[in-house]
A protein has these predicted regions:
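Acyl-donor-binding surface of acyltransferase catalytic domains
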Residues: 86-175, 326-333
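Conserved active-site alpha-helix within GNAT-family acetyltransferase domains
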Residues: 127-143, 284, 296-297, 308-326
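Conserved GNAT-fold acetyl-CoA-binding loop/helix
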Residues: 7-40, 201-220
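Conserved GNAT-family N-acetyltransferase fold
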Residues: 57-59, 146, 233, 243-247, ...
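Conserved donor-binding loop and adjoining core beta-sheet/short helix segment
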Residues: 31-103, 242-264
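Flexible, substrate/cofactor-facing loop regions flanked by secondary structure
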Residues: 169, 174-266
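A short beta-loop-alpha structural element at the N-terminal edge
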Residues: 1-17, 178-193
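Conserved acetyl-CoA-binding loop-helix of GNAT-fold acetyltransferases
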Residues: 90-110, 270-273, 279-292, 296, ...
Length: 338
Protein backbone atom coordinates (compact mmCIF):
# COMPACT_ATOMS: atom_id res chain seq x y z
CA UNK A 1 0.00 0.00 0.00
CA UNK A 2 1.38 3.41 -0.96
CA UNK A 3 1.97 6.25 1.48
CA UNK A 4 -0.62 8.31 -0.42
CA UNK A 5 -3.31 5.65 -0.06
CA UNK A 6 -2.63 5.35 3.68
CA UNK A 7 -2.85 9.12 4.23
CA UNK A 8 -6.02 9.57 2.19
CA UNK A 9 -7.87 6.39 3.15
CA UNK A 10 -10.99 6.13 5.28
CA UNK A 11 -9.03 5.16 8.40
CA UNK A 12 -6.85 8.27 8.12
CA UNK A 13 -9.91 10.47 7.63
CA UNK A 14 -11.49 8.93 10.73
CA UNK A 15 -8.33 9.58 12.77
CA UNK A 16 -8.32 13.18 11.58
CA UNK A 17 -11.99 13.63 12.46
CA UNK A 18 -11.46 12.23 15.97
CA UNK A 19 -8.43 14.46 16.45
CA UNK A 20 -10.58 17.39 15.37
CA UNK A 21 -13.19 16.61 18.01
CA UNK A 22 -10.48 16.58 20.66
CA UNK A 23 -8.98 19.83 19.37
CA UNK A 24 -12.30 21.66 19.38
CA UNK A 25 -13.10 20.42 22.87
CA UNK A 26 -9.74 21.74 24.04
CA UNK A 27 -9.82 25.09 22.23
CA UNK A 28 -12.56 26.58 20.01
CA UNK A 29 -10.02 28.75 18.18
CA UNK A 30 -8.32 25.69 16.66
CA UNK A 31 -9.07 24.70 13.06
CA UNK A 32 -10.40 21.40 11.85
CA UNK A 33 -7.41 19.16 11.03
CA UNK A 34 -6.46 19.51 7.38
CA UNK A 35 -6.08 16.39 5.24
CA UNK A 36 -2.55 15.02 5.22
CA UNK A 37 -0.54 14.91 2.02
CA UNK A 38 2.48 12.68 1.35
CA UNK A 39 5.62 14.81 1.29
CA UNK A 40 8.12 12.08 2.15
CA UNK A 41 8.31 8.36 1.49
CA UNK A 42 8.01 7.31 5.14
CA UNK A 43 4.90 5.39 6.17
CA UNK A 44 4.16 6.89 9.57
CA UNK A 45 1.20 5.06 11.05
CA UNK A 46 0.37 3.33 14.34
CA UNK A 47 -2.31 0.66 14.61
CA UNK A 48 -3.93 -1.30 17.43
CA UNK A 49 -3.44 -5.10 17.55
CA UNK A 50 -6.78 -5.48 15.80
CA UNK A 51 -5.69 -3.20 12.96
CA UNK A 52 -7.53 -0.02 13.98
CA UNK A 53 -5.54 3.08 13.02
CA UNK A 54 -4.54 5.01 16.15
CA UNK A 55 -2.21 7.67 14.72
CA UNK A 56 -0.90 8.78 11.38
CA UNK A 57 1.58 11.40 10.26
CA UNK A 58 3.05 13.11 7.24
CA UNK A 59 6.57 14.52 7.24
CA UNK A 60 8.05 17.37 5.23
CA UNK A 61 11.51 18.93 4.87
CA UNK A 62 12.14 22.68 4.70
CA UNK A 63 15.56 23.99 3.66
CA UNK A 64 16.03 27.69 4.30
CA UNK A 65 17.07 30.30 1.77
CA UNK A 66 20.27 31.77 3.24
CA UNK A 67 19.13 35.28 2.32
CA UNK A 68 15.54 35.02 3.63
CA UNK A 69 14.25 36.31 6.96
CA UNK A 70 12.68 32.90 7.66
CA UNK A 71 16.15 31.57 8.38
CA UNK A 72 16.36 33.83 11.43
CA UNK A 73 13.36 32.19 13.08
CA UNK A 74 14.86 28.71 13.42
CA UNK A 75 17.15 26.00 12.16
CA UNK A 76 18.43 26.16 8.59
CA UNK A 77 17.03 22.70 7.85
CA UNK A 78 13.68 21.74 9.39
CA UNK A 79 12.00 18.35 9.31
CA UNK A 80 8.34 18.77 10.26
CA UNK A 81 5.76 16.20 11.27
CA UNK A 82 2.02 16.74 10.91
CA UNK A 83 0.32 14.28 13.26
CA UNK A 84 -3.26 13.08 13.62
CA UNK A 85 -3.97 10.98 16.70
CA UNK A 86 -7.41 9.41 17.10
CA UNK A 87 -9.49 9.33 20.24
CA UNK A 88 -10.40 11.52 23.20
CA UNK A 89 -7.80 13.11 25.47
CA UNK A 90 -6.07 10.66 27.75
CA UNK A 91 -3.26 8.10 28.10
CA UNK A 92 -4.19 6.37 24.83
CA UNK A 93 -3.40 9.56 22.90
CA UNK A 94 -0.09 9.92 24.73
CA UNK A 95 0.87 6.33 23.91
CA UNK A 96 -0.17 6.54 20.25
CA UNK A 97 1.75 9.79 19.73
CA UNK A 98 4.80 8.29 21.43
CA UNK A 99 4.75 5.35 19.03
CA UNK A 100 4.26 7.66 16.04
CA UNK A 101 7.22 9.79 17.14
CA UNK A 102 9.28 6.62 17.44
CA UNK A 103 8.53 5.75 13.83
CA UNK A 104 9.45 9.26 12.73
CA UNK A 105 12.67 9.03 14.71
CA UNK A 106 13.53 5.88 12.77
CA UNK A 107 12.91 7.68 9.48
CA UNK A 108 15.08 10.65 10.48
CA UNK A 109 17.85 8.33 11.63
CA UNK A 110 18.04 7.02 8.06
CA UNK A 111 18.70 10.51 6.67
CA UNK A 112 22.33 11.70 6.91
CA UNK A 113 21.16 15.31 6.48
CA UNK A 114 19.13 15.10 9.70
CA UNK A 115 22.30 14.62 11.75
CA UNK A 116 23.75 18.03 10.82
CA UNK A 117 24.07 20.58 13.63
CA UNK A 118 21.79 23.28 12.18
CA UNK A 119 18.72 21.05 11.88
CA UNK A 120 15.51 20.60 13.84
CA UNK A 121 12.69 18.10 14.08
CA UNK A 122 9.54 20.19 14.47
CA UNK A 123 5.98 19.42 15.44
CA UNK A 124 3.19 21.89 16.19
CA UNK A 125 0.82 20.50 18.81
CA UNK A 126 -2.28 22.27 20.16
CA UNK A 127 -1.27 23.90 23.43
CA UNK A 128 -4.42 22.86 25.29
CA UNK A 129 -4.32 19.27 24.00
CA UNK A 130 -2.15 18.30 26.95
CA UNK A 131 -2.19 14.57 26.20
CA UNK A 132 0.72 15.06 23.80
CA UNK A 133 3.20 16.75 26.13
CA UNK A 134 4.54 13.69 27.96
CA UNK A 135 5.24 11.83 24.71
CA UNK A 136 7.05 14.79 23.19
CA UNK A 137 9.23 15.29 26.26
CA UNK A 138 10.00 11.58 26.40
CA UNK A 139 11.24 11.67 22.82
CA UNK A 140 13.61 14.59 23.40
CA UNK A 141 11.53 17.53 22.21
CA UNK A 142 11.56 20.94 23.92
CA UNK A 143 8.72 23.50 23.75
CA UNK A 144 10.62 26.37 22.12
CA UNK A 145 7.89 28.64 20.79
CA UNK A 146 4.19 29.40 21.06
CA UNK A 147 1.69 30.60 18.49
CA UNK A 148 -0.61 32.77 20.59
CA UNK A 149 -4.03 34.11 19.63
CA UNK A 150 -6.18 37.06 20.58
CA UNK A 151 -9.72 37.00 19.25
CA UNK A 152 -11.48 40.26 18.53
CA UNK A 153 -15.07 40.64 19.75
CA UNK A 154 -16.32 39.44 16.36
CA UNK A 155 -13.91 36.52 16.39
CA UNK A 156 -14.95 35.45 19.89
CA UNK A 157 -18.58 35.39 18.79
CA UNK A 158 -17.62 33.24 15.79
CA UNK A 159 -15.85 30.73 18.04
CA UNK A 160 -18.28 29.95 20.83
CA UNK A 161 -16.52 29.73 24.16
CA UNK A 162 -13.51 31.81 23.10
CA UNK A 163 -14.64 34.97 24.85
CA UNK A 164 -11.74 34.80 27.30
CA UNK A 165 -9.38 35.47 24.40
CA UNK A 166 -10.68 39.00 23.88
CA UNK A 167 -8.06 41.53 24.87
CA UNK A 168 -8.13 44.26 27.50
CA UNK A 169 -9.39 47.78 27.04
CA UNK A 170 -7.30 50.16 24.96
CA UNK A 171 -4.04 51.29 26.56
CA UNK A 172 -2.81 54.86 26.23
CA UNK A 173 0.93 55.48 25.88
CA UNK A 174 2.79 56.66 28.98
CA UNK A 175 3.32 60.36 29.55
CA UNK A 176 5.84 61.85 27.14
CA UNK A 177 5.48 59.05 24.57
CA UNK A 178 3.51 59.25 21.34
CA UNK A 179 2.67 56.45 18.93
CA UNK A 180 2.35 57.12 15.22
CA UNK A 181 2.18 55.13 12.04
CA UNK A 182 5.64 54.45 10.65
CA UNK A 183 6.81 55.85 7.32
CA UNK A 184 9.67 54.86 5.00
CA UNK A 185 11.82 57.47 6.75
CA UNK A 186 11.62 55.35 9.92
CA UNK A 187 13.17 52.26 8.35
CA UNK A 188 16.53 52.52 10.12
CA UNK A 189 14.92 53.00 13.55
CA UNK A 190 12.49 50.12 12.97
CA UNK A 191 15.30 47.76 12.01
CA UNK A 192 17.41 48.82 14.98
CA UNK A 193 14.58 48.17 17.44
CA UNK A 194 13.64 44.93 15.69
CA UNK A 195 17.19 43.65 16.01
CA UNK A 196 17.06 44.24 19.76
CA UNK A 197 14.11 41.82 19.91
CA UNK A 198 15.85 39.21 17.78
CA UNK A 199 19.06 39.39 19.81
CA UNK A 200 17.18 39.04 23.08
CA UNK A 201 15.07 36.12 21.81
CA UNK A 202 18.22 34.36 20.60
CA UNK A 203 18.96 33.53 24.25
CA UNK A 204 16.08 31.08 24.30
CA UNK A 205 17.07 28.59 21.62
CA UNK A 206 14.65 29.25 18.78
CA UNK A 207 15.67 32.46 17.03
CA UNK A 208 19.16 32.85 15.56
CA UNK A 209 20.73 36.01 14.23
CA UNK A 210 22.26 35.06 10.88
CA UNK A 211 24.75 36.92 8.67
CA UNK A 212 21.75 37.78 6.48
CA UNK A 213 19.42 38.89 9.29
CA UNK A 214 20.00 42.65 9.08
CA UNK A 215 19.61 42.76 5.30
CA UNK A 216 16.60 40.44 5.36
CA UNK A 217 14.85 42.39 8.12
CA UNK A 218 15.55 45.65 6.30
CA UNK A 219 14.08 44.28 3.07
CA UNK A 220 11.02 42.90 4.88
CA UNK A 221 10.29 46.17 6.66
CA UNK A 222 10.90 48.22 3.50
CA UNK A 223 8.35 46.13 1.62
CA UNK A 224 5.82 46.51 4.42
CA UNK A 225 6.34 50.28 4.57
CA UNK A 226 5.69 50.52 0.83
CA UNK A 227 2.11 49.32 1.37
CA UNK A 228 -0.65 51.92 1.84
CA UNK A 229 -1.43 52.48 5.53
CA UNK A 230 1.02 49.82 6.73
CA UNK A 231 0.39 48.16 10.06
CA UNK A 232 3.66 49.46 11.43
CA UNK A 233 3.94 51.87 14.32
CA UNK A 234 6.73 53.72 16.06
CA UNK A 235 6.71 54.87 19.69
CA UNK A 236 8.74 58.01 20.35
CA UNK A 237 9.76 59.85 23.48
CA UNK A 238 10.29 63.29 22.08
CA UNK A 239 12.12 62.55 18.84
CA UNK A 240 13.77 59.39 20.21
CA UNK A 241 12.35 56.05 18.93
CA UNK A 242 11.71 53.76 21.91
CA UNK A 243 9.42 51.07 20.50
CA UNK A 244 8.06 49.56 17.31
CA UNK A 245 5.45 47.13 16.07
CA UNK A 246 5.13 45.49 12.66
CA UNK A 247 2.12 43.39 11.68
CA UNK A 248 0.72 41.72 8.59
CA UNK A 249 -2.81 42.43 7.47
CA UNK A 250 -4.98 39.37 6.71
CA UNK A 251 -4.10 39.53 3.01
CA UNK A 252 -0.41 39.09 3.90
CA UNK A 253 -1.03 36.61 6.74
CA UNK A 254 -2.51 33.82 4.62
CA UNK A 255 0.52 31.65 5.36
CA UNK A 256 -0.46 31.33 9.04
CA UNK A 257 -4.25 31.65 8.73
CA UNK A 258 -4.80 27.84 8.59
CA UNK A 259 -3.55 27.61 12.19
CA UNK A 260 -6.92 28.89 13.44
CA UNK A 261 -10.51 28.07 12.66
CA UNK A 262 -11.78 31.66 12.49
CA UNK A 263 -11.10 34.23 9.81
CA UNK A 264 -9.78 36.66 8.82
CA UNK A 265 -6.54 36.37 10.75
CA UNK A 266 -3.78 38.97 11.07
CA UNK A 267 -0.22 38.31 12.22
CA UNK A 268 1.87 40.41 14.58
CA UNK A 269 5.34 39.91 13.14
CA UNK A 270 7.53 41.76 15.61
CA UNK A 271 7.18 44.15 18.52
CA UNK A 272 10.03 45.61 20.52
CA UNK A 273 10.59 48.20 23.20
CA UNK A 274 13.94 49.62 24.21
CA UNK A 275 15.17 47.93 27.39
CA UNK A 276 15.16 51.19 29.36
CA UNK A 277 11.44 51.69 28.57
CA UNK A 278 10.19 48.17 29.34
CA UNK A 279 7.52 47.90 31.99
CA UNK A 280 6.35 51.47 31.50
CA UNK A 281 3.40 50.87 29.19
CA UNK A 282 4.98 51.48 25.78
CA UNK A 283 4.53 47.88 24.65
CA UNK A 284 0.95 47.72 25.88
CA UNK A 285 0.11 50.91 24.00
CA UNK A 286 1.68 49.59 20.79
CA UNK A 287 -0.19 46.28 21.06
CA UNK A 288 -3.42 48.13 21.80
CA UNK A 289 -2.96 50.42 18.79
CA UNK A 290 -2.51 47.47 16.47
CA UNK A 291 -5.46 45.54 17.97
CA UNK A 292 -7.76 48.54 17.62
CA UNK A 293 -6.87 48.97 13.95
CA UNK A 294 -7.19 45.24 13.28
CA UNK A 295 -10.65 45.11 14.84
CA UNK A 296 -11.77 48.17 12.88
CA UNK A 297 -10.62 46.43 9.70
CA UNK A 298 -12.83 43.42 10.43
CA UNK A 299 -10.11 41.06 11.67
CA UNK A 300 -11.38 38.13 13.74
CA UNK A 301 -8.15 37.00 15.36
CA UNK A 302 -4.55 38.17 15.73
CA UNK A 303 -1.78 35.57 15.85
CA UNK A 304 1.83 35.94 16.92
CA UNK A 305 4.86 33.88 17.94
CA UNK A 306 6.81 34.22 21.16
CA UNK A 307 9.60 32.22 22.77
CA UNK A 308 8.15 29.80 25.29
CA UNK A 309 10.85 30.40 27.91
CA UNK A 310 11.29 34.14 27.39
CA UNK A 311 10.48 35.45 30.90
CA UNK A 312 9.09 38.70 29.49
CA UNK A 313 6.96 37.44 26.61
CA UNK A 314 4.48 35.05 28.21
CA UNK A 315 3.28 37.39 30.98
CA UNK A 316 3.23 40.41 28.67
CA UNK A 317 1.20 38.81 25.91
CA UNK A 318 -1.16 37.24 28.42
CA UNK A 319 -1.87 40.71 29.82
CA UNK A 320 -2.67 41.87 26.27
CA UNK A 321 -5.31 39.15 25.87
CA UNK A 322 -3.25 36.57 23.96
CA UNK A 323 -3.12 32.92 24.95
CA UNK A 324 -1.26 29.88 23.65
CA UNK A 325 -2.94 28.22 20.68
CA UNK A 326 -0.13 25.99 19.39
CA UNK A 327 3.15 24.97 20.97
CA UNK A 328 6.10 24.47 18.64
CA UNK A 329 8.12 21.52 19.90
CA UNK A 330 11.62 21.01 18.50
CA UNK A 331 14.36 18.44 18.77
CA UNK A 332 17.83 19.64 17.75
CA UNK A 333 19.58 18.29 15.81
CA UNK A 334 16.80 16.47 14.03
CA UNK A 335 18.60 13.15 14.13
CA UNK A 336 19.06 13.21 17.92
CA UNK A 337 15.52 12.28 18.97
CA UNK A 338 15.15 9.55 21.55
Amino acid sequence: MSVRSVLTGDAALRAGAEAGLRWRAADPLLPAPAPLHPECDAELAVAAPGGELLAIGSCAHWLGDPDALDLTWGAASRFELSARVAGPAGPAVTDALDRLLGRWRGHLASLPSAAAADTAAVIHWPSRDVSGAAALLRRGFAPLAVIAARATAAGARAAAGAGSAVGPKASAPPEGVRIRRATPDDLEALVRLGLEVIRFDAHFGGVRERPSTVAALTAEFAAMLAEPQPWMWLAERGSDPVGMLAAEKPAQAQWIAPMTGIAPAAYLLLMGVRASERGGGVGAALASTMATEAEAAGTSVILLHYAQVNPLSAPFWSQQGYRPLWTCWEGRPAGALR
